[in-house]
């Protein structure tokens, strides 16, 4: 028979709770940690409550307060009951929070996702480096870096393209034609004007003094037969000192019949004497800068000759060189494969307010194109009088 003394049973509720804590079995450290990490939601095996038998002696006097304490002690909840109640409360609070969050969602982007999942996605993006709170300066610096890299890459591509083209042209002109075939090669650089000054080599082939004298005689001959000159200046035409007028300025230049380009002429370094000024690369080649015309007809003839045809086999060209007064009958410079126009310009001063200006072309004889009189009138105006103009001539 089990029995309990009065001193072992508490008389109030606080003492009952303290007694329950004292009777609660202590858990080991490993079991306590595993229950914290992996909480048990469904306890299939419920811990049985402690059943205590009380036997009261017949002759013992037990008060009602002691009996009440014994009843409270026997009805105290176990640890498993308290744990299950706590877990049920936490699950119900989570469900209520999720339902409340779903009710308050009004954004279309959360139609298939919850705000909680969206926050997790944003956190993942931030961890990967895609932060939405990046400053504007950082974005601009990133954009500038990308633009700089693209421009650098574009420059490298274009540099490689132009470098390859230049290497192919230089290799063909210098290595193949000059060094291997021992021929002259011309490398064009940029287009040039048809009109250019006579070079030192050209001036050696043209008698400039003769052209100057002939042009002056032709001008005085035309002016002596002009009515305005006869009335206002008289015949023979004299200057302010009573002497024959003299030339104040005279110049000559040439004009090609075809478009011209400026380029580099390269030849094998054979050390022969030449009238041109050459720059030499020892044992490789010699080169100089010159102007050359681009003959379209000559280019077509060369292409047809390479495939065994001639121009007459395809079409007939009526060349202006066969017409009198054309380029064929202009002054041809010796050693050149093309004809040139030789132009001249002169000025004759009659007095302080009158100046004769003329220009023309030279071949075997002088052919004047235009003669003008520039005179300052009494009112101070400078007036140009056209005394002669060759309408049929080609300028």
Curated annotation (Swiss-Prot):
Q: Where are the transmembrane segments?
A: 156-176
How does the protein associate with the membrane?
Single-pass membrane protein
This protein's UniProt keywords? Membrane, Mitochondrion, Transit peptide, Transmembrane, Transmembrane helix
Q: Tell me, in one coarse class, where this protein mainly resides.
A: mitochondrion
Subcellular localization: Mitochondrion membrane
Glycoprotein: present as a keyword of the record? Answer: no
Q: What happens when the gene is disrupted?
A: Increases frequency of mitochondrial genome loss.
CC annotations in GO: cytosol; mitochondrial membrane; mitochondrion; peroxisome
Report if keyword Transferase is assigned: no
Q: Give the family per the record.
A: Belongs to the AIM39 family.
Name of protein: Altered inheritance of mitochondria protein 39, mitochondrial
Q: Which organism is it from?
A: Saccharomyces cerevisiae (strain ATCC 204508 / S288c) (Baker's yeast)
